[in-house]
Design a protein with these regions (language model features):
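Extracytoplasmic/secreted proteins, especially bacterial periplasmic and envelope-associated proteins
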Residues: 31-35, 39, 56, 76, ...
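Periplasmic OmpA-like peptidoglycan-binding domain that tethers envelope proteins to the cell wall
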Residues: 142-216
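Amphipathic, membrane-active segments
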Residues: 74-105
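C-terminal motif of bacterial Sec signal peptides marking the signal peptidase cleavage site
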Residues: 16-20
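Periplasmic peptidoglycan-binding/anchoring modules of Gram-negative envelope and division proteins
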Residues: 83-84, 107-141, 165-168, 198-200, ...
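Bacterial N-terminal signal peptides that target proteins for export
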Residues: 1-9
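Short, low-complexity, glycine-enriched hydrophobic/amphipathic alpha-helices that associate
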Residues: 22-80
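Acidic/histidine-rich, surface-exposed loop or edge segments in extracytoplasmic proteins
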Residues: 60-64, 101-108
Length: 222
């Protein structure tokens, strides 16, 4: 019970940081979140919210002036992704970026081979990732609850791996990539409706500062 109270207290604090000051820009919010959350809070918030990518981004924040520097770097990258990739839903979380591709954009039903048309969008994403090279990237596959949990886990892993392989083929450094499959374990909508299941079938891309960028940010902060 005490742990649950702590988790939700952290969630409320996070929401206050992101929503309580409407006049803040994304960079300022990122600095505040990083200063107030930290890795432990990020992990707990991710667990409570049921979204590993969001928790990872919150936990990776450094906060303060350095966090604001990283936030500006991410703002520019997020703007380019939103502008150039029509099929991507882009969120700025802390000092990172979460991109969501509905699986229907990338894959046919129950398949892990990329649709031909989706390769254009992933090529554009690769160009931006290569331009902003001082980041780590997690690729997270997700499914709905149709079929067995074991099958869904395997499908989500194969799809995340397929996206990773395509990015590497477009010269994204594989050392930057972490590939994960979560199967049906992290739904973002109800699996009781067709619309909800469609939202749950997705690939998420989490982007956050690597050690090099954090070092530069710390030096800029003095």
């Amino acid at each position: 019970m005490t742990k649950k109270i702590l988790v939700w207290a952290l969630v409320i604090a996070f929401l206050a940081a992101t929503m309580g000051c409407a006049e803040w820009n994304r960079t300022q919010k990122g600095a505040a979140i990083g200063a107030g959350a930290g890795a432990a809070a990020g992990g707990l918030i991710g667990a409570a919210s049921g979204n590993t990518a969001a928790g990872l981004l919150i936990g990776a924040a450094v906060g303060g002036v350095a966090g604001a520097f990283i936030g500006r770097y991410m703002d520019k990258q997020a703007e380019e992704i939103e502008r150039d990739i029509a099929g991507a839903r882009v969120e700025r979380i802390g000092e990172g970026i979460k991109i969501t591709f509905d699986s229907g954009i990338l894959f046919d039903v129950n398949q892990a081979d990329l649709k031909y048309d989706s390769q254009t969008e992933l090529a554009q994403l690769s160009t931006i990732l290569n331009k902003y090279a001082d980041t780590n990237i997690m690729l997270a596959g997700h499914t709905d609850s149709t079929g067995s949990a074991e099958y869904n886990m395997g499908l989500s892993q194969r799809r995340a791996r397929t996206v990773a392989d395509y990015l590497v083929a477009q010269n994204v450094d594989p050392i930057r990539l972490d590939v994960q499959g979560f199967g049906e374990d992290e739904p973002i909508a109800s699996n009781d409706t067709a619309a909800g299941r469609a939202l749950n079938r997705r690939v998420e891309v989490a982007i956050w500062a690597n050690d090099k960028l954090k070092k530069v940010a710390a030096e800029k902060a003095g």
